Amino acid sequence: MSFLVRAPFSARVLPLAEVPDPVFASGVVGDGRALLPDDDVTCVTVHSPIDGVVTKLKSHAAIITSTRGPSILIHLGIDTVGLRGRGFAPLVEEGDIVDAGTPLIHWDLGPVRGAGLSPCAPIVVVNPPGEPVSPEFDEALPTVGILDPLFSLPDSD
Protein backbone atom coordinates (compact mmCIF):
# COMPACT_ATOMS: atom_id res chain seq x y z
CA MET A 1 0.00 0.00 0.00
CA SER A 2 1.22 3.53 -0.71
CA PHE A 3 0.63 6.96 0.75
CA LEU A 4 -1.05 9.28 -1.79
CA VAL A 5 -0.41 13.02 -2.00
CA ARG A 6 -2.94 15.04 -4.00
CA ALA A 7 -2.51 18.28 -5.95
CA PRO A 8 -3.39 21.27 -3.73
CA PHE A 9 -4.46 23.30 -6.79
CA SER A 10 -4.74 23.00 -10.58
CA ALA A 11 -1.46 23.56 -12.40
CA ARG A 12 1.26 22.20 -14.64
CA VAL A 13 3.48 19.64 -12.90
CA LEU A 14 7.26 20.02 -12.97
CA PRO A 15 10.02 17.79 -11.66
CA LEU A 16 11.85 19.38 -8.74
CA ALA A 17 14.99 19.66 -10.89
CA GLU A 18 13.18 22.39 -12.88
CA VAL A 19 12.38 24.54 -9.82
CA PRO A 20 14.29 27.85 -10.10
CA ASP A 21 15.78 27.46 -6.62
CA PRO A 22 18.90 25.35 -6.03
CA VAL A 23 17.79 24.11 -2.60
CA PHE A 24 14.49 22.68 -3.88
CA ALA A 25 15.94 21.63 -7.27
CA SER A 26 18.72 19.60 -5.63
CA GLY A 27 16.22 17.64 -3.55
CA VAL A 28 17.92 18.66 -0.32
CA VAL A 29 14.56 19.62 1.25
CA GLY A 30 12.99 16.35 0.10
CA ASP A 31 11.52 14.65 -2.94
CA GLY A 32 8.27 15.66 -4.58
CA ARG A 33 7.03 17.68 -7.50
CA ALA A 34 6.36 21.35 -8.21
CA LEU A 35 3.22 23.01 -9.50
CA LEU A 36 3.27 25.99 -11.84
CA PRO A 37 0.00 27.92 -12.21
CA ASP A 38 -0.92 28.93 -15.75
CA ASP A 39 -0.01 32.50 -16.73
CA ASP A 40 -3.67 33.54 -16.91
CA VAL A 41 -4.42 32.38 -13.34
CA THR A 42 -4.60 35.33 -10.94
CA CYS A 43 -5.75 33.71 -7.68
CA VAL A 44 -5.51 30.21 -6.26
CA THR A 45 -7.08 28.55 -3.25
CA VAL A 46 -4.51 26.09 -1.95
CA HIS A 47 -6.00 22.90 -0.48
CA SER A 48 -4.50 20.34 1.85
CA PRO A 49 -2.98 17.50 -0.20
CA ILE A 50 -3.45 14.97 2.62
CA ASP A 51 -5.44 14.30 5.79
CA GLY A 52 -3.47 15.50 8.80
CA VAL A 53 -2.56 18.34 11.14
CA VAL A 54 -1.24 21.77 10.17
CA THR A 55 2.10 21.53 11.98
CA LYS A 56 3.68 24.68 10.52
CA LEU A 57 2.03 27.66 8.85
CA LYS A 58 3.54 30.76 7.30
CA SER A 59 1.72 33.07 4.92
CA HIS A 60 3.53 31.49 1.94
CA ALA A 61 3.99 27.90 3.16
CA ALA A 62 2.44 25.11 5.19
CA ILE A 63 3.49 21.72 6.49
CA ILE A 64 0.76 19.12 6.91
CA THR A 65 1.65 16.04 8.95
CA SER A 66 -0.32 12.84 8.48
CA THR A 67 -1.18 10.55 11.37
CA ARG A 68 0.33 7.86 9.12
CA GLY A 69 3.73 9.56 9.31
CA PRO A 70 4.65 11.65 6.27
CA SER A 71 4.90 15.45 6.46
CA ILE A 72 4.26 17.42 3.27
CA LEU A 73 5.58 20.95 2.65
CA ILE A 74 3.66 23.24 0.32
CA HIS A 75 5.86 26.24 -0.55
CA LEU A 76 4.05 28.89 -2.59
CA GLY A 77 6.46 30.52 -5.00
CA ILE A 78 10.21 31.02 -4.93
CA ASP A 79 11.71 33.66 -2.61
CA THR A 80 8.18 34.71 -1.61
CA VAL A 81 9.13 35.02 2.07
CA GLY A 82 10.38 38.50 1.07
CA LEU A 83 6.81 39.56 0.24
CA ARG A 84 6.08 39.51 3.99
CA GLY A 85 2.64 38.03 3.51
CA ARG A 86 1.46 40.23 0.63
CA GLY A 87 -0.80 38.17 -1.60
CA PHE A 88 -1.30 35.35 0.91
CA ALA A 89 -4.28 34.85 3.24
CA PRO A 90 -4.04 31.79 5.52
CA LEU A 91 -7.42 30.13 6.07
CA VAL A 92 -6.33 27.75 8.87
CA GLU A 93 -4.11 27.91 11.94
CA GLU A 94 -1.27 25.76 13.23
CA GLY A 95 -2.72 22.79 15.08
CA ASP A 96 -5.87 22.58 12.94
CA ILE A 97 -6.90 19.09 11.84
CA VAL A 98 -7.56 19.05 8.09
CA ASP A 99 -8.80 16.63 5.48
CA ALA A 100 -7.43 16.37 1.95
CA GLY A 101 -9.24 19.20 0.20
CA THR A 102 -9.52 21.58 3.16
CA PRO A 103 -8.69 25.13 1.97
CA LEU A 104 -5.40 26.24 3.57
CA ILE A 105 -4.32 29.52 1.95
CA HIS A 106 -5.81 31.96 -0.54
CA TRP A 107 -3.00 33.03 -2.89
CA ASP A 108 -3.17 36.18 -5.03
CA LEU A 109 -0.43 35.74 -7.63
CA GLY A 110 -0.29 39.46 -8.47
CA PRO A 111 2.33 40.41 -5.85
CA VAL A 112 4.51 37.41 -6.78
CA ARG A 113 4.49 38.19 -10.48
CA GLY A 114 4.69 41.95 -9.86
CA ALA A 115 7.91 41.43 -7.89
CA GLY A 116 9.36 39.32 -10.71
CA LEU A 117 9.31 36.16 -8.58
CA SER A 118 8.46 32.67 -9.76
CA PRO A 119 5.04 31.27 -8.81
CA CYS A 120 6.51 27.75 -8.98
CA ALA A 121 5.28 25.88 -5.88
CA PRO A 122 7.28 22.88 -4.62
CA ILE A 123 5.21 20.15 -2.93
CA VAL A 124 7.77 18.13 -0.99
CA VAL A 125 7.95 15.21 1.44
CA VAL A 126 9.98 16.63 4.34
CA ASN A 127 9.51 13.63 6.62
CA PRO A 128 10.57 10.87 6.31
CA PRO A 129 13.73 12.43 4.87
CA GLY A 130 15.09 11.02 1.63
CA GLU A 131 11.94 9.07 0.82
CA PRO A 132 11.60 8.82 -2.99
CA VAL A 133 8.19 9.49 -4.52
CA SER A 134 6.41 7.91 -7.47
CA PRO A 135 4.41 10.07 -9.91
CA GLU A 136 0.67 9.42 -9.88
CA PHE A 137 -0.25 11.61 -12.86
CA ASP A 138 0.14 11.11 -16.61
CA GLU A 139 3.68 12.36 -17.25
CA ALA A 140 2.83 12.70 -20.96
CA LEU A 141 0.16 15.29 -20.02
CA PRO A 142 1.71 16.93 -16.97
CA THR A 143 -1.22 18.94 -15.68
CA VAL A 144 -3.35 18.21 -12.65
CA GLY A 145 -6.65 19.46 -11.29
CA ILE A 146 -7.44 20.23 -7.67
CA LEU A 147 -6.99 17.05 -5.59
CA ASP A 148 -5.90 14.91 -8.53
CA PRO A 149 -3.30 12.31 -7.51
CA LEU A 150 0.14 13.96 -7.65
CA PHE A 151 2.62 11.45 -6.21
CA SER A 152 2.85 8.61 -3.74
CA LEU A 153 5.41 7.13 -1.42
CA PRO A 154 5.65 3.77 0.29
CA ASP A 155 3.35 3.49 3.30
CA SER A 156 5.19 3.44 6.61
CA ASP A 157 2.68 0.98 8.10
Language-model features: where?
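Contiguous, well-folded functional domains in the mature portion of proteins
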Residues: 1-157
